[in-house]
């Protein structure tokens, strides 16, 4: 456990970054009356779901959990970026919410800044949580929250396009069979695969299944395995299996390309399930294959329920009740269904599949998934991701070979993470 003095120093540094971000974006206010220092009986919860108003099932759940714990819950929903900034500022003012729900890559940032308690400190039971999902919130062997659920990536396919090309999606089990399928699709006069390779975190998110699926590691971007993954993508563009638009595609615009009906495959996430039903064509979903076969580890998305540090540690007893209520099996099932997430425990995953067998492939993908900040990368991850997306942008645009692009990326990442 880092010393209090060092934690406060890191917190001040993190707040400085947050303040700079606020000045560039939307501006921040201290909102000194809305944090943890509230009257006895009032507990605050901050979440990244501003789309849910007080009449929503989500807010009703928060209220019910408070009532069951004998307290009144005061809830505020923020946009994800704004939430991180406000959490850092509130911690500096000793005014943190009692429960903070944040995107999983943010957990390491807040934990490193000394903002969060460990699950051991608050006595939150994480024994039933899938270890690969819990890992996104583990730093230095300690857990700093519990996942509310997870989303990840897989391959959607257009059955009509594959049928016309004579491709059985069940035969797509590795990179060789996937590329062979794309060849047949192109020969049949259709489009192969669309994805997002934009120069942002979205692009890295979409590249990681191929990178990890080759056996590469984020601590060595220019390994032979990493080069193989980037070569797969560049070869697809060279051969016309993927469009040049992937360089600027977000996950949303990539989906729009697939929804137009001409592409055989699209790499996208669980959050597109509702939209898939609206496409007007028969679709299916298969896991993203690893190079040698099997399901590739895809990155996890989704939020963690965390407990910020409070000067009055007696509050943790109620905080534990709130967290336990929000993540209980019945409540997790309802919340994950609303958010199009896969649950974080085997028991709830089995219930999800029993209710909707279309989720089977997503459960398989989540079981193989991996947190971007896992392997104790923590706050180093963003310093690795940016050189990585710079590398695949360079290689896909033809300004550098995959090997040279990743060599440059490794040099940059190594210097940034010393």
Show where each model-derived region lies.
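Glycine-centered hinge/linker elements that transmit conformational signals in sensory
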Residues: 182-186, 219-247
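Conserved C-terminal helix/tail region of periplasmic/extracytoplasmic solute-binding proteins
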Residues: 2, 163-164, 368-418
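Hinge/lid segment of periplasmic solute-binding proteins
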Residues: 104-152, 179-180, 187, 206, ...
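Extracytoplasmic/periplasmic substrate-recognition and gating elements
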Residues: 165, 238-242, 277-339
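Periplasmic solute-binding protein
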Residues: 110-115, 133-170, 198-218, 300-308, ...
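Extracytoplasmic "Venus flytrap"/periplasmic binding protein-like
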Residues: 66-131, 164-166, 264-265, 275-276, ...
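Conserved N-terminal structural module of periplasmic/extracytoplasmic solute-binding proteins
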Residues: 2-107, 292, 314, 318, ...
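Long, aromatic- and glycine/proline-rich binding clefts that accommodate carbohydrate-like moieties
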Residues: 337-387
């Amino acid at each position: 456990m880092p010393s209090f003095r060092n934690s406060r120093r890191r917190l001040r540094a993190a707040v400085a970054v947050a303040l700079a971000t606020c000045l560039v974006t939307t501006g921040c206010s201290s909102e000194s009356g809305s944090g943890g220092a509230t009257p006895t009986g009032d507990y605050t919860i901050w979440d990244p779901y501003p789309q849910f108003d007080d009449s929503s099932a989500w807010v009703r759940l928060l209220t019910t959990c408070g009532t069951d714990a004998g307290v009144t819950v005061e809830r505020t929903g923020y946009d994800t970026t704004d939430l991180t900034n406000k959490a850092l500022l509130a911690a500096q003012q000793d005014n943190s919410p009692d429960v903070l729900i944040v995107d999983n890559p943010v957990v390491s940032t807040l934990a490193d800044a000394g903002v969060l308690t460990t699950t051991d400190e608050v006595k939150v039971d994480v024994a039933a949580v899938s270890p690969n999902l819990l890992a996104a919130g583990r730093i230095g062997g300690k857990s700093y929250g519990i996942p509310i659920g997870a989303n990840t990536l897989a391959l959607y396919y257009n059955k009509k396009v594959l049928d016309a090309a004579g491709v059985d999606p069940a035969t797509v089990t590795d990179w060789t069979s996937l590329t062979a399928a794309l060849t047949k699709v192109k020969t049949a006069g259709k489009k192969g695969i669309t994805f997002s390779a934009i120069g942002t975190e979205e692009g890295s998110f979409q590249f990681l299944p191929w990178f990890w699926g080759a056996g590469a590691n984020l601590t060595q971007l220019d390994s032979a395995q990493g080069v193989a993954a980037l070569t797969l993508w560049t070869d697809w563009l060279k051969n016309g299996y993927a469009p040049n638009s992937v360089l600027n595609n977000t996950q949303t615009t990539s989906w729009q390309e697939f929804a137009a009906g001409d592409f055989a495959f699209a790499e996208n996430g669980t959050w597109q399930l509702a939209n898939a039903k609206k496409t007007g064509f028969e679709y299916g979903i298969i896991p993203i294959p690893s190079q040698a076969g099997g399901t590739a580890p895809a990155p996890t998305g989704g939020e963690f329920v965390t407990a910020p540090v409070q000067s009055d540690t007696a509050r943790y007893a109620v905080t534990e009740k709130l967290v336990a209520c929000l993540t209980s099996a019945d409540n997790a099932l309802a919340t994950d269904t609303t958010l199009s997430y896969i649950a974080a425990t085997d028991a709830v995953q089995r219930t999800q599949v029993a209710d909707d067998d279309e989720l089977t492939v997503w459960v398989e993908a989540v079981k193989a998934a991996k947190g971007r900040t896992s392997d104790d990368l923590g706050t180093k991850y963003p310093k690795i991701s940016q050189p990585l997306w710079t590398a695949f942008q360079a290689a896909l645009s033809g300004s550098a070979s995959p090997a040279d692009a990743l060599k440059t990326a490794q040099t940059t990442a190594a210097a940034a993470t010393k």
